[in-house]
Amino acid sequence: MGIETVYQDLALADDLSVGANIFLGREPVRRLFGVLPIIDNGRIRRETQALLARIESRIPPSARTVSRLSGGQRQAVSIARALYWQAKVVIMDEPTAALAAMEREHVIQLARRLASEGAGVIYIGHNLIEILEVADRVAVMYRGRIVHVTQASDSHQEELIKYMTGFNSAAA
């Protein structure tokens, strides 16, 4: 329960299942004969199915490995992982890069879901329309420094572009 990251490059283990990716490095174990610890694959399956239903995932049950999933489905796996582990902060680094419009909308809905369930979401991106749609507050960086912070509801694309490109005197 801490910080989770949803990467732009869909950083998942391609040859593993959806459940194995969600639990990667934190696999539940059970004791065989009361002694030998083994991964509890049944629990992983059950909890993964419940989690995917909870996020209204479009991931087909027949998908054996994440390599068979679309970009949006893969991002849903990363976001589901953050939800399952009850992250307090989720850093989303351009989570909709290279996604189709429908997939992008589903990822945006999941980002909102994270926030509604109490996670602080840091949403990094270049698509200002998307940023203004998702964010409560917007911070603009120029040359590695934060040059402007404002409420998203008070912001306009044109104003943010000036800060992003250094054409606003405060960013110079």
Predicted regions and their residues:
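Glycine-rich phosphate-binding loops of nucleotide-dependent enzymes
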Residues: 1-172
